[in-house]
Amino acid sequence: MAQFLSKPFGMTPNGEKINEYIISNPGGLAVSVLNYGCIIKNIWVPTKSGPVDVVLGHDTYADYVKDFESSGSTCCGAFVGRYANRIENAVFNVGGKTYQLEANNGKNHLHGTFPRKLYEVKTFGDTLLLEAESPDGEDGFPGNLKISVRYILTEDNALRMDYRVSSDADTIINLTNHTYFNLDGGGDVLGQKLRIYASRYLEGNNETCPTGNILPLSLIHISE
């Protein structure tokens, strides 16, 4: 059975409380999550020499706000949406209608406002549940959304992320978590290797907007 701890992390200009929630299991895995952006602030994994934090995070709420509101935001640790990645020219079509979005990355739309939302938090079993809503027209997207994010610690010391969204209108959605990992807990990552089991990839243009072309993967593409 997981254990839960909460503590203050900051306050918005409107007086809303930012809290840090730490969920840990008997196997020694612990995860720190904020109700601001569903941010994963820390992941401590058990090692022979003690717990090691294997993700990057900021020390204060103000640091996260400064990051997320900058033109070069890293979205460090955040739950990203309504649409992760870039939408070219900040425009798309769905249900026979054209929607113009906020152009927040040059002429394109990038990620959306989910990283800057406040979420209601519930805990049960091995699960931290965060819930919020996104009104119709937010960032230009159609549909009122109900959002739930679950962070679950499993018995084999894994962190599972479960996203669920419902909409009352035709819309598009593409969700991800924007955590940065350093498996050594510090220093650079140049000696670390990542293996991706894939045979194809989604092509991007010179502004890294998806072209819609799904191409075969090769070692040349990986090195690029």
Model-derived regions, located:
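Extended, loop-rich substrate-binding clefts of extracytoplasmic carbohydrate-active enzymes
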Residues: 2-17, 22-26, 97-98, 102-156
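Beta-strand-rich N-terminal accessory domains
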Residues: 7-61, 88-94, 98-99
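A conserved active-site cap/scaffold subdomain adjacent to cofactor or substrate pockets
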Residues: 187-219
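Acidic, contiguous internal or C-terminal segments within carbohydrate-active enzymes
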Residues: 24-25, 29-39, 133-185
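Conserved small/polar residues in nucleotide/adenosyl-binding loops
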Residues: 220-224
